[in-house]
Amino acid sequence: MYTHMEYLQRCFYKSTSWNEDNIYANVTATSQALLDFSIPSGAKLDVSTQATDHSASSMSLSNMHTINGSLAYLFSSTPLKNTMGTRDVSLQDAVAGFRIIEPFFSGTHTKTDSSDVNRASLLYGRMYFPGTALEAMLIKRISASAQLLVKCINNPHIRKGGTMIVYLQENTPRFSREYIYSTNEALFGFRCLYNFGKPTKISPALIPKFDNSVVSVGAEFWYAALGMSPGLSTAVRYSTRSTSTGKPLTMTLACNPILGHISSTYNVKTSVSSTVCSKYDFNWFSYASNLSIGFELYNFFKPSHVFKHYHADQRRNPSIHHDTLAPVADPYVLGTRPTNNSVSYAFPEKPRKRVVNSIQNLDDYYHINPSRLHRSPAYDVDDDVSGRSVMEAFQNSVNESNFSSVLKGSTSLSDRMVKLLWVGRYKDFLVSTGIKVNLNPFTNLPEINKIGVTFSYAC
């Protein structure tokens, strides 16, 4: 689960049209979210408040071994108007999960907004207690496609009392590149990522059978000047969506030739509420291998009894997998009136407006009319255009689904462990609790490695 400060940082990127998925470090972000999620340790309480559209503060307390905590502050020159607290935020925004890759999409801004975005900046600082540990971050937009990112840590327990990392990033729909310098070991780095695919601005009649199929190829190079040690890794990511079901999938292949390590992942969103991930690691120097499997399962809020007849009728129409679509709270979201004449509905004169996914752009890019799902199988339009409608409708259903909780799980054969994480709502709080169980290598008996619970509140 994201902290509120991480959530605000993602909203800042979205409001300034900065594509996080187009960065080399996030090539395997989906598999990391489904397999390498963290388990809370002990009990923790996070309380955050957003005083204005430009500033926010946060405090956390935990009792892991000793009572400790932190104070944080964030300032954004760009107003973050579409952010929400833990009471209203959707779980899709609060929890890291499957990412649909769209490197060619960029938000639209007016001339006034563009000038503000080009000068946008974000300041973040956190102080830990007890102790004197500090951390800070600065994000400064240089132009519409470039930004400066600076991260600093001040801790007496690390070498020289602290370290600083500077990123100069350029992010365009076709490629991205980063120049990195770290004061630790005088480390120099370069990352690049190039996307092979067709932009979404292409005419719909020319869209191939698999829409938004993108192949991303990237690499990173490192050199530590003090230790005179190099580093190298490469990665390939393939992302696509099926036109028959609209379900996206992502495959990645990463390789570190110096260490002899290769890793492949396969991630697929099997329905609106479920995702499955698998990862295979192999080292050609030691011949060691490992297989990891993870899943993510969302739970819907129980729909009102008024809509049960409607969903029963819709399941009789197999034009798309209606049994995987989320129940919605407003008939106007469905786009069509129910066909069951035995049930009457009282529609309001004006449809109610609601914001479900603040991180997604508030335009019509995803928000198509879902009534296009209920067309007759005898399509009188091109198959590619109808396939595009199915994919957009599936994505629209994911964004507008009202989930009450999410369950994550992962296991690793080589590590002989199982992790479970549950994130849900309790009144105005977001609750995250989980457990990690390992097998003792000597007795082969299960033992609890980590267990905890986190309560988060933001307003």
Curated annotation (Swiss-Prot):
InterPro entries: Mdm10
Origin superkingdom: Eukaryota
Keyword Mitochondrion on entry: yes
Keywords: Membrane, Mitochondrion, Mitochondrion outer membrane, Transmembrane, Transmembrane beta strand
Membrane topology, from the record: Multi-pass membrane protein
Primary subcellular site in the record, as a coarse category: mitochondrion
Location in the cell: Mitochondrion outer membrane
GO biological process: establishment of mitochondrion localization; mitochondrial genome maintenance; mitochondrial outer membrane translocase complex assembly; mitochondrion-endoplasmic reticulum membrane tethering; phospholipid transport; protein insertion into mitochondrial outer membrane
Function: Component of the ERMES/MDM complex, which serves as a molecular tether to connect the endoplasmic reticulum and mitochondria. Components of this complex are involved in the control of mitochondrial shape and protein biogenesis and may function in phospholipid exchange. MDM10 is involved in the late assembly steps of the general translocase of the mitochondrial outer membrane (TOM complex). Functions in the TOM40-specific route of the assembly of outer membrane beta-barrel proteins, including the association of TOM40 with the receptor TOM22 and small TOM proteins.
Family designation: Belongs to the MDM10 family.
Subunit-level organization: Component of the ER-mitochondria encounter structure (ERMES) or MDM complex, composed of MMM1, MDM10, MDM12 and MDM34. Associates with the mitochondrial outer membrane sorting assembly machinery SAM(core) complex.
Domains: entry comment: Lacks alpha-helical transmembrane segments, suggesting that it resides in the membrane via beta-sheet conformations similar to those predicted for other outer membrane proteins and porin.
Protein's name according to its UniProt entry: Mitochondrial distribution and morphology protein 10
